[in-house]
Amino acid sequence: MTSLGLYIHIPFCRSRCDYCGFYSIGRKPTDRYIDALIKEMDLKSPDFEDRLCDTVYLGGGTPSSLSEAQLTRLMKALSQHFRISDAAEITMEMNPCDMSESYLKNAMRAGVNRISIGVQEKHDHLLSAIGRRHTAKEAETAVKRAYRMGFHNLSLDLMYELPGQTVKDFEASLRWAVHLPVNHMSIYSLILEDGTRMAQLAERGRLARPSEEESWAMYQAMCRILPAYGFERYEISSFARKGYRSRHNQKYWELSDYLGLGPAACSRIGRTRTENTPGVRLYEKELLTGHPPQQEVETLSDIDEMEEYCFLHLRMKEGLPLDGFRKRYGEDITHWYGDAVKMLKEKKLLKEDAGHLFLTYHGAALGNFVFEQFLQD
């Protein structure tokens, strides 16, 4: 039987970042919410009793907004309901402000062995501009403290194309980050999500963002600096030193099975994709009165899955295996995407080598355009 990934959504934040489009609410987690999560485990875990969970990911929101007691209780419940591998990668997203020595000790005792830290930038004026609560010094102290206490699988999130950010700012952030004791970085360009404060400012013409030339220079800096310090780009937004790829995120890109718990959490089992409806109060009410959470359910068609197979594999360093596509869908990729592949090769956005299709250097920079070519009308 294939392995299973677990995702647990902790949709609480002390304050909402100006760019964030994820479902979250501005208050501390309650014990009632942990009660509801455990009820969801009660309902769903029997269907997975023969599956070995080799990755667990606590995402948000801000999972480190959980109290030490709440985190301990949650992790204990997971181990009681699911078969967690002794070698499982257990990741928890943390805000630098929450990473006290006491909190880190408790997280380690609870089973967390990988921390993803939302750093975003090294310049305090830019952190303030995007609504982050921590300073660069607090982030650096938190990272070094976690490493000193035995967390050697640490990941940083960084962002570029921020309002007011210069190429020199981003280069300085990269050079600062590579000298921290981390082995993984996720680097994202700013996307203006509908309904966020930043999107509203942009609509009013009050958001000064880097030019296209500056954005391209930032992209080039990322691709130049990180490999020079041993960080391999193994996915379009992800860089890791050898042996430190995110095993949980690879499940998403490889179309593997994962189960999501919590409001707005997504699951994918085979070709069935489900999403719990957002709303903490509704989620708690349903589960604490003995009902499953309301869900949206979608069964992927052959075409839907084929599209995902193409653009998710193209995100990764290993690329899209042409023989794997043929075996999975019964036809060469040219049967479905011949014109698109030809056009993308001519534009030097795709290349073919050793039976795989890969994004080129420029193709990775224009990833969304490339991926759109694999969507059927």
Task: Spell out what each predicted region is.
Residues 8:
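Conserved N-terminal Rossmann-fold NAD(P)-binding element of oxidoreductases
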Residues 331-343:
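Short amphipathic alpha-helical interaction segments
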Residues 1-4, 15:
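Flexible, acidic/Gly-rich N-terminal and inter-domain linker regions that tether
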Residues 3, 24-47, 51-331:
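C-terminal scaffold of the Radical SAM
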Residues 364-377:
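Short, amphipathic alpha-helical interaction segments positioned at domain boundaries
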Residues 345-355:
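A short, conserved structural fragment
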Residues 356-360:
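Minor-groove-contacting beta-hairpin "wing" of winged helix-turn-helix DNA-binding domains
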Residues 11-22:
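Local cysteine-cluster metal-coordination motifs and their immediate loop/turn environment
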